[in-house]
């Protein structure tokens, strides 16, 4: 096992990365190794997808499957080894079908890629794990060095984050052939074990630029189906009655669940990155979408254990449900998996609803505590002139984009302290689950404009980018000249690709934490600092002083 893709990875003087029987996320060595094998098969599939496009062959089944299966290897998504192997077998079957299509056009069709003809050696998981050793990401570290390995992983993990967003968009009916062609090209190239530093750096920026387009179509999918989010108050306390909790990012799953629970007497609560769903008109119209439950994903083993109903996980993040003994009432959807937990193959939630009706639910309603969400792209753009006016009258000094992932590391309290230290004449724009560090606190307003503005899920960084570009255009300056600072927390691969997206768009002087990614060496961090001004957090006092004086 070698995995260094998330923020909580093991860090020792001998090197970074989880390399024992189990990773810090709870992923076993078996599952981790089989995910490496799956990625290798997906690189071979992409190699043939690139070749097929040369013949004008575009297979939508291949295009939809490839990023979805890649998504299953993202942190805290799928821990079920047999399902990982199932994805690998499906990848090979699709590859062979695509290969046959190419050969039907050109009998001499060939692909020069080491993954292009990969076959699984056995049905036995142990044998497959041994085969997976050929594809461990750091297998040639001694030959290429830590810097090249780090750049490879930056590209691989960034592309994985983009693949997740591609799947979210595809679920909503969004498909862009150019994006998929670019994805396959990059994925196939990474399967050749590239070792050119400049080419890898260029690839990382290409991934960022591609992901901006992915976030654009995801935004179109979400707003096209569920309307543009508008500011909405959400109760974060319990309401009496039977209940279901839904977590993850998939708004379509939430919509289907709301439709199927309507009139059943079962209330629905959002958790984690589902919180922004309350801002969408077509979702909040369901009166039994009663509120948001819990806090950051890392607290789920305590909070889910206390929830008196079933739980549905639609994407990341799931962690071991046996710890809180709720494994009999947690359900996985789509690419999510945990051994022994019931999985929903389709969009029928009747079994979950039946379980909710058999459980006690909340016995009484608590005193409501309301927070505000729903500052989507349209709302943010509508406030652009107000922001400019406040700045011109010196009522608004600075905007801090304070967002990203949450996690268990104690150093993450920095983000709570930072938020509470932001001066009263400054505004906090937040997104993603890092907001749970401070989103239940009171921040007041500036002439009626809330000082805490919740822009949505991690992918809604797109809305923040569009706002920044709009403000810069109106003020006749560059984005980096705005009174705007980005202070980002990271945990997994979606955060990595958001960072690459920002860097590829030329955004500079981003501050990140709580730690630097374990796969980025001091040399690589120095390059990113020199090129983009990217740096790690220090202390709240020092960072605040530096950012306000910039």
UniProtKB/Swiss-Prot annotation:
Details of cofactor binding: Binds 1 [2Fe-2S] cluster. Binds 1 hybrid [4Fe-2O-2S] cluster.
InterPro entries in the record: HCP/CODH, Hydroxylam_reduct, Prismane-like_a/b-sand, Prismane-like_sf, Prismane_a-bundle
Keywords from the named record: 2Fe-2S, Cytoplasm, Iron, Iron-sulfur, Metal-binding, Oxidoreductase
Modification sites for Cysteine persulfide: 405
Residues bound to [2Fe-2S] cluster: 3, 6, 18, 25
GO MF entry, a single one: 2 iron, 2 sulfur cluster binding
Alphabetical list of Pfam families matching this protein: Prismane (PF03063)
Protein function: Catalyzes the reduction of hydroxylamine to form NH(3) and H(2)O.
Similarity remark: Belongs to the HCP family.
HAMAP family, per the entry: Hydroxylam_reduct
Record-given protein name: Hydroxylamine reductase
